Amino acid sequence: MKNPCNVIAIIGKPRDQQAIQTHKELYEWLTSEGYKVFIDDRLAAILDEIPQNHFASLVELGKNADLAIVVGGDGNMLGAARILSRFDVPVIGVNRGNLGFLTDLNPDDFQAALKAVLAGEYIEEERFLLEAEVHRHGQIKSHNAALNEAVLHPGQIAHMIEFEVYIDESFAFSLRADGLIVSTPTGSTAYSLSGGGPILSPSLNAISLVPMFPHTLSSRPLVVDGKRRIKLIVSPENRGTQEVSCDGQVSLPVSPGDEIHIYQSPNVLKLIHPKDYSYYHVLRNKLGWSSKLF
């Protein structure tokens, strides 16, 4: 993180009055500390007491901020990450969601922890993203990025599809299933975990492939090197439409016969944590693991 940190962005789409209050408190505290603060312009109508020239788009915030503070749950962090990862701006989260795997700071007592971070007492880690492209007749029809996962699934609920999986152009397996979750280590505690996938330490350079309700007893999750390129060829015999969902927020339409190319993005998310952060403490706390015996 740039030191000294002069320009700070506040990002997030609040779902309730408590989250709105956190945005206000952050803005007031940071400005009182002497920082230049800009806010996600999607909040301009909600925070109408703040001068309009203190609002900017996510792209502008990414270009100009030294630090971005995301208020909300992991969903807000995922949405911000897909844009902010294009820029060299570190991100820290204030949790106003449910689990909050990616948002560390307590909204009721963020000042002390944030002050320490701004003084240089923090842990910085890089989380890689995936790029997902839909190819049709040799051309890219659509693409997007995902911090958690890219998921091939049917457009209709509870409708099986058939597809082939290639890893670095080498045929791996075919599958008749509800879909396939292609997950980063960051996403291994999200949708992938619900689908029976493994938990991957965020420092691992690996990608997991997790079948969704496969019509076979032999199908199991597969972990491959993070530099491998995944190609899914959708059967031309599939009925209806399919989709590739990026982080559950962006959907790319897929037609029978299309190819989906998934690979590691050149961009990374720079995630900032307080100095006392422990990934395994987060797992134990969020997933309800047992405490120490002695």
Swiss-Prot record:
Its cofactor is a divalent metal cation. It catalyses: NAD(+) + ATP = ADP + NADP(+) + H(+). Keywords: ATP-binding, Cytoplasm, Kinase, NAD, NADP, Nucleotide-binding, Transferase. GO terms for biological process: NAD metabolic process; NADP biosynthetic process. The active site is at 74 (proton acceptor). One of its GO terms (cellular component) is cytoplasm. NAD(+) binds at residues 74-75, 148-149, 159, 176, 178, 189-194, 249. GO terms for molecular function: ATP binding; metal ion binding; NAD binding; NAD+ kinase activity. Gene3D superfamilies: Probable inorganic polyphosphate/atp-NAD kinase, domain 1 (3.40.50.10330), Probable inorganic polyphosphate/atp-NAD kinase, domain 2 (2.60.200.30). Pfam families: NAD_kinase, NAD_kinase_C. Transmembrane segments: none annotated. It is found in: Cytoplasm. Involved in the regulation of the intracellular balance of NAD and NADP, and is a key enzyme in the biosynthesis of NADP. Catalyzes specifically the phosphorylation on 2'-hydroxyl of the adenosine moiety of NAD to yield NADP. Belongs to the NAD kinase family. NCBIfam families: PRK01231.1, PRK03378.1. This is NAD kinase.
